[in-house]
Each structure stands twice: as structure tokens, then as C-alpha cells.
Amino acid sequence: MEKREELYRGKAKSVYKTDDADRLILLFRNDTSAFDGKRIEQLDRKGTVNNKFNAFIMQKLEEAGIPTQFDKLLGDNECLVKKLDMIPVECVVRNYAAGSLVKRLGIEEGTKLNPYTFELFLKDDAKGDPFINESHVVAFGWGTAEQLVRMKELSIKVNEVLTKLFDDAGLLLVDFKLEFGVFHGEIVLGDEFSPDGCRLWDKDTRKKMDKDRFRQGLGDVIEAYEEVANRLGVPL
């Protein structure tokens, strides 16, 4: 597989074209951002940890019948993925109250949500990733009603699979965001799944083991990521 020019540079990953029109290479960088890219720092080992963490999770999801864009690892900080036509919507599943939900509704952080909640946000840093609903998505042409049904269905299945996976490792899956795209007419899970895009707490102590350590200045960010990976059995 030949790596060609950079197609897109995000806050923490770069996307490269390849000699296959249906495949891209994701490069996980050490960049760590918060507050819609307003704060960015370099954290040693982060690109490697997130690349291998993502590969592990995507393979677990594939085994559970969830279609993902992941193909294979290419190195410590690169992987080969399917080229998706991305839908500019973030799907957020919450099992416990945290983050923007706490700010919006005044719920106490850590409150267990029964059942989980499912939310949609427009993927637009300039607008602060605003909270939207299904009718916005369809009305503005960001996705179809049928695609939304499938995205919610897959998000719920991801939650079922990963809640158990993390629980077995002594961790609470507090919440997470997913992005989807279309590949040959099928809705497929895209982007990544790592501690950058979810909240993970130790089940006993409620210690935060995710990017909130960076957002809130708690320190030991990568050490926490590595501890989560080690508990899951991710080969780093």
C-alpha cells in the first residue's frame, strides 16, 4: 500500500490518500487538544497508544458484528482504513452524567442514567459542536432518516459491547462519541475509539482515566491511557 499526499489534518490525526481509491491511512499524532482545539499540547507516546487502543476496540466491535472502517495496523502510529463518506454528526451515548450534560441540565456528575441517553451534535468546531436533533440532520441534508436509525442502532450495540468490556476491566464507560460514514452504501463506524473520545472512570475510586485529565489539568494523562490499555490487554 503506497502512502500518498495528506488529505486532511485534524486536531490529533492526519489522513493520507493511498494508491487504492477505497483506502486511507490514519496517522495518530501526539497532539492533544481541548475546548474545540483552543488548547493544544504534545504528549509523548499518545499517538502510539491511541492507534493501538483504537485497533483493539475496533476489532472487538467487528467481532460483535459492528461494521467499522478499520482494516489493519501499519505501524506504531498508523493504520489502514476504508475511505468513508463521513456524516458530519457526532452520536453521543451517556451512561453516567458528565461533561456538557452536567452543564446543560444541572445534573450531578456521576449520576447513573437509566436508561442511557443518546444525543446528536453537529461536527463543527467553529460553532462549538452544537447540540442538534434528528429533524435538523434531515432538514439540512447532513444525513437521512434511514441513516439516523442505523447510526442509533449501531451506537446502542457499541454501548452494549463496550460497557461489558470495560466493566470486566474494572472501569465504568461513562460516555462516548461515535462518528459514522457510508462505504459502498453501508453505514460504517468511522473515526476512532480511544480515551480521547470517551470518559472512563475506575469502578471503585471513580478516578478519571480519560482526556478529562488533560481538560481539567489533573496530570498523568498518558499514564492513565496506558493503564486502561493494560487492563484491557491492549498490546502496546
UniProtKB/Swiss-Prot annotation:
GO biological process per UniProt: 'de novo' IMP biosynthetic process; cobalamin biosynthetic process
A GO CC annotation given for this chain: cytosol
Catalytic reaction equation(s): 5-amino-1-(5-phospho-D-ribosyl)imidazole-4-carboxylate + L-aspartate + ATP = (2S)-2-[5-amino-1-(5-phospho-beta-D-ribosyl)imidazole-4-carboxamido]succinate + ADP + phosphate + 2 H(+)
The keyword ATP-binding is annotated on this UniProt entry: yes
UniProt keywords, alphabetically: ATP-binding, Ligase, Nucleotide-binding, Purine biosynthesis
ATP-binding listed as a keyword: yes
GO molecular function term, any single one: phosphoribosylaminoimidazolesuccinocarboxamide synthase activity
InterPro entries documented for this protein: SAICAR_synt/ADE2_N, SAICAR_synt_PurC, SAICAR_synth, SAICAR_synthetase, SAICAR_synthetase_CS
Pathway(s) of this molecule: Purine metabolism; IMP biosynthesis via de novo pathway; 5-amino-1-(5-phospho-D-ribosyl)imidazole-4-carboxamide from 5-amino-1-(5-phospho-D-ribosyl)imidazole-4-carboxylate: step 1/2
Stored CDD domains: SAICAR_synt_PurC
Enzyme Commission code(s) on record: 6.3.2.6
Domain of life, source organism: Bacteria
HAMAP family (alphabetical): SAICAR_synth
Similarity comment text for this entry: Belongs to the SAICAR synthetase family.
PANTHER family: MULTIFUNCTIONAL PROTEIN ADE2, SI:DKEY-6E2.2
Protein name in the entry: Phosphoribosylaminoimidazole-succinocarboxamide synthase
